[in-house]
């Protein structure tokens, strides 16, 4: 706040803490030109990375209404319109005193309510990176217990933003719809798979070894594998009738589409429980534990906790991912700030059939979880019930920048749609109550 009070210019240039940069040719003039001509509240740009003397382009992604995560990457340099900043501070208040980490995040969110935050898709400076961890390592920063105080502060700021924008939801949940019975079994484990000959047998046996007080089956949606996966599944299915080996008629399916094939099939149970084709359940009572949790409060969805392991099932950092930041009072609101909700994910099928999953292979679970949480309560299991393998064949281990950008932009899009839907729902509820 002291900095904002002392600024006497029309614009304020921010260099992010801990960053070493070198502005490009006429970079400042370009930033000033764009912010002046567009009337934006803030502009930021792509840049170049300098690693061991070599330069490479580092494009960022566009800012959307759903770009409310505190980890949104603005790069190392941004230019703010002080006119827009003062207008936002007058309307919504300055960042509150006592914030240790979230002051700029708070200002950014307030600024975004009435002003455009605009990306310039040009590399206007060179940055020397200070965080060279793979994307697969950075994605778990928000569940690091060492960052708990930081995360609480960020959640408080994000919650205030959702309240200001009309998208915050009180902890009032809809009752579950009646089951569309009869279901062939109580629960179905669902595994979408393509070309996982090294791991699919382990995953299948992990599911079939479950001990439960109810009937269950395993639906493996084999997305036209070209290695030995299909052969392995056919052999396993011939030995255990609980294994249902589905090969879709379509050849354009992502992971979400494969899930839909299973969920809308006649062999799906009342509850559908996730198991990825290279992962394992942590013990043989996981299904029992999941269904018990569903029955505690009649949840529409239950999400467990998992441990990250290597191919040989040895725990590797960051270890347990338990999402203890979740609360009944604010979990579905904070879900709009963070990048994932955990695993394994399990669904009450009558609700899931109302929603379905988008036919993509990233963010499909986040999409359906956000929509379910808009109406229904989600239950949590905080002890580890799942092993998530990280190995050279795993798609989440280390993403190229272009892929990471595409994924982040897609999740911001999902948040944009969800925020709009929640604002509309709140508006309609307010109209009904008046």
Annotated model-derived regions:
Residues 52-76, 318-338:
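Short, flexible, basic/aromatic active-site loop/helix in glycosyltransferases
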Residues 20, 25-57, 285-318:
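Conserved donor NDP-sugar-binding/catalytic core segment of glycosyltransferases
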Residues 20-21, 222-232, 251:
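A conserved acidic beta->alpha catalytic loop
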Residues 205-215:
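Short, acidic, metal-binding catalytic loop of nucleotide-sugar glycosyltransferases
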Residues 97-107, 361-368:
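Acidic donor-binding loop at a coil-to-helix junction in glycosyltransferase catalytic cores
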Residues 118-130, 302-305, 379-385, 390:
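Catalytic beta-strand/loop signature of glycosyltransferases that borders the donor
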Residues 8-22, 269-280:
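Short beta-strand-to-loop acidic/aromatic patch adjacent to the donor-nucleotide binding site
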């Amino acid at each position: 706040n002291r900095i904002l009070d002392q600024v006497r210019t029309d614009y304020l240039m921010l260099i992010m803490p801990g960053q070493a940069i070198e502005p490009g040719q006429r970079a400042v003039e370009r930033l000033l030109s764009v912010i002046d001509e567009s009337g934006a509240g803030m502009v930021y740009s792509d840049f170049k990375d300098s690693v061991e003397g070599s330069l490479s382009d580092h494009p960022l992604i566009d800012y959307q209404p759903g770009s409310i995560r505190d980890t949104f990457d603005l790069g190392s340099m941004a230019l703010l319109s002080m006119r827009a900043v003062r207008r936002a501070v007058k309307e919504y208040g300055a960042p509150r005193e006592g914030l240790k980490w979230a002051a700029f995040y708070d200002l950014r969110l307030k600024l975004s309510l009435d002003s455009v935050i605009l990306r310039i898709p040009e590399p206007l400076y060179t940055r020397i990176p200070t965080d060279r961890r793979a994307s697969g390592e950075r994605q778990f920063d928000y569940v690091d217990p060492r960052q708990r105080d930081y995360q609480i502060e960020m959640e408080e700021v994000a919650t205030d933003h959702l309240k200001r924008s009309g998208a915050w939801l009180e902890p009032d949940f809809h009752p579950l719809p009646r089951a569309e019975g009869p279901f062939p079994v109580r629960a179905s484990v669902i595994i979408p798979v393509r070309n996982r000959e090294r791991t699919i047998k382990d995953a299948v046996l992990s599911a079939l070894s479950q001990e439960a007080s109810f009937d269950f089956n395993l639906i493996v949606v084999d997305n036209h594998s070209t290695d030995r996966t299909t052969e392995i599944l056919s052999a396993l299915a011939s030995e255990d009738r609980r294994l249902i080996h589905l090969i879709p008629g379509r050849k354009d399916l992502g992971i979400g589409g494969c899930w839909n094939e299973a969920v809308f099939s006649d062999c799906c149970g009342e509850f559908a429980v996730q198991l990825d084709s290279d992962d394992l359940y942590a013990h043989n009572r996981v299904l029992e534990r999941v269904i018990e949790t569903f029955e505690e409060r009649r949840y529409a969805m239950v999400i467990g906790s998992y441990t990250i392991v290597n191919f040989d099932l040895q725990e590797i950092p960051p270890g347990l991912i338990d999402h203890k930041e979740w609360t009944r009072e604010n979990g579905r609101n904070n879900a709009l700030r963070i990048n994932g909700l955990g695993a394994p994910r399990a669904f009450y099928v009558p609700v899931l059939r109302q929603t379905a999953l988008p036919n993509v292979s990233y963010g499909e679970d986040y999409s359906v979880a956000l929509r379910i949480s808009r109406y229904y309560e989600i239950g949590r299991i905080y002890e580890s019930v799942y092993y998530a393998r990280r190995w050279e064949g795993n798609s989440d281990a280390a993403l190229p920048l272009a892929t990471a950008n595409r994924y982040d932009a897609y999740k911001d899009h999902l948040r944009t749609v969800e925020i709009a839907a929640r604002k509309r729902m709140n508006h309609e509820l307010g109209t009904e109550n008046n």
